[in-house]
Amino acid sequence: MDSAEPLTYDQYLATLPDERRESVARVWQVVRDHMPPGYVEEIGPKFLQFATGAEGYVALANQKNYVSLYLLPVYVDPSLKQKLDCVDKKLKVGKSCLNFNHHDDLPLDIIGEIVGTFTPQEFQEKLSRNRTSHRA
């Protein structure tokens, strides 16, 4: 397959190590089930993403030692981060993501809530306000 050709979801899953495939599929299914209408699903050779325009909303990427789930709504609304901070599980938090090896490492119910928070228009407006306030 030409590397410029877009992958299908099943093709993306097939590129993952066996031990990660089920967890990635379970986490991404939660994302899909809670995604508000209007976002576009994009599948690349290294990631899965829902975006609006040029802005990513939620993404999942297979890394060398773990899988990373990027939840951009958390960065435009601090109250959403507080939901993650209150979780009983010890989360592996990166600079802009949650890192995991198995889907059981994650609070999937809270992730679903976070994913479902903003319509594309609401997310774009929040993002724009945040960028404007950081420049001031």
Q: Each PLM stretch: what is its role?
A:
Residues 1-136:
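Charge-dense, helix-prone N-terminal extensions
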